[in-house]
């Protein structure tokens, strides 16, 4: 069987990883084994954090909504319940943007919901 020399292929593979880890600190950018471990961990963490980002933004929108609604005397869950009663299908991101960028519109929305919520609670 003929001998296969892997020098070029192996060097290319190592160089590719070392190029990726160029900005890493210490040995993680110089030594192949450490760089490879850091590269694998970086890929894993980027995968995890792409999902975590969605959770974090949703909780941020909810916090902003809660703060905006509490100014008017309700809390978050009562506000969302009132939206469901009135069949207003705005997501939390949109509501959060409205509360920050256009408070007059948000107050108008709140003023339309408040009587309906009180009416619904009194009927039960």
Swiss-Prot record:
SUPFAM superfamilies according to UniProt: Ribosomal protein L20
Name listed for the protein in its UniProt record: Large ribosomal subunit protein bL20c
Chief subcellular location: plastid
Subcellular localization(s) per the UniProt record: Plastid, Chloroplast
Any one GO cellular component localisation term in the record: ribonucleoprotein complex
Function text: Binds directly to 23S ribosomal RNA and is necessary for the in vitro assembly process of the 50S ribosomal subunit. It is not involved in the protein synthesizing functions of that subunit.
Keyword annotations: Chloroplast, Plastid, Ribonucleoprotein, Ribosomal protein, RNA-binding, rRNA-binding
Biological process per Gene Ontology, one example term: translation
Pfam annotation, one family: Ribosomal_L20
Molecular function GO terms recorded: rRNA binding; structural constituent of ribosome
InterPro entries for this protein: Ribosomal_bL20 (IPR005813), RIBOSOMAL_L20_CS (IPR049946), Ribosomal_protein_bL20_C (IPR035566)
Source lineage: Eukaryota, Viridiplantae, Chlorophyta, core chlorophytes, Chlorophyceae
Similarity-based family: Belongs to the bacterial ribosomal protein bL20 family.
Keyword Transcription part of the UniProt annotation: no
Coiled coil: none
Organism: Stigeoclonium helveticum (Green alga)
């Amino acid at each position: 069987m003929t001998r296969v020399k892997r020098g070029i292929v192996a060097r290319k593979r190592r160089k590719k990883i070392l190029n990726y880890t160029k900005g890493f600190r210490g040995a993680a950018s110089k030594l192949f084994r450490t760089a490879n471990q850091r590269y694998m961990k970086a890929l894993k963490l980027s995968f995890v954090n792409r999902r975590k980002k969605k959770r974090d933004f949703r909780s941020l929108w909810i916090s902003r909504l809660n703060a905006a609604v509490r100014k008017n005397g309700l809390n978050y869950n009562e506000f969302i319940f009132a939206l469901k009663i009135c069949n207003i299908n705005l997501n939390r991101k949109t509501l959060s943007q409205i509360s920050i960028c256009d408070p007059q519109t948000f107050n108008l929305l709140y003023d339309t919901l408040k009587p309906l919520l009180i009416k619904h609670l009194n009927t039960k």
